[in-house]
């Protein structure tokens, strides 16, 4: 989806003013970048929204990286013994204008991956990160055994941030991108 598609069919929870703010890439590349937290149930349009925003950022020549959190965690666990590779990945992720973590704490991740995720968020301080999740920050801590790490990670995500809660009454994928029936 593109920004034009999103503007033509915005989720009802996003009024014109916040939508205009999201279209303006200043929240990503301005002097005070913000994190974006998009919360909603399956089918609520979270991915539709974040893909349109990512496409808009790319069209403005900003660098964007998308990770499903479980895939990032698997990669981090795979290179766990290679400290240099882990540090290189953290450094690489920290350089993007916008990093998107989708399916955020939909499933548990290893304590190692959680610690490195904290390092990534620390390295991204002052840069925009988008979190896409079915649950809010109050639930993420349930997936993180170390409560100090949980509080610190959540604090780095939420401050400073914008939050959009989608209620899921409409499945935007079905509504605006119908597939042919065979």
Listing of model-derived features with the role each one plays in the protein:
Residues 31-32, 60, 93-96, 124-127:
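Short loop/turn elements that form and flank the Walker-type P-loop nucleotide-binding site
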Residues 32-49:
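Walker A/P-loop nucleotide-binding motif
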Residues 6, 50, 68:
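Conserved hydrophobic/aromatic pocket- or pore-lining residues that grip, position, or stack substrates
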Residues 55-67:
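Post-Walker A helix-loop "phosphate-sensing" segment adjacent to the P-loop in P-loop NTPases
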Residues 35-37, 64, 98, 130:
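Residue-level preference for the first positions of well-ordered beta-strands
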Residues 3-26:
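N-terminal pre-Walker A segment at the start of P-loop NTPase domains
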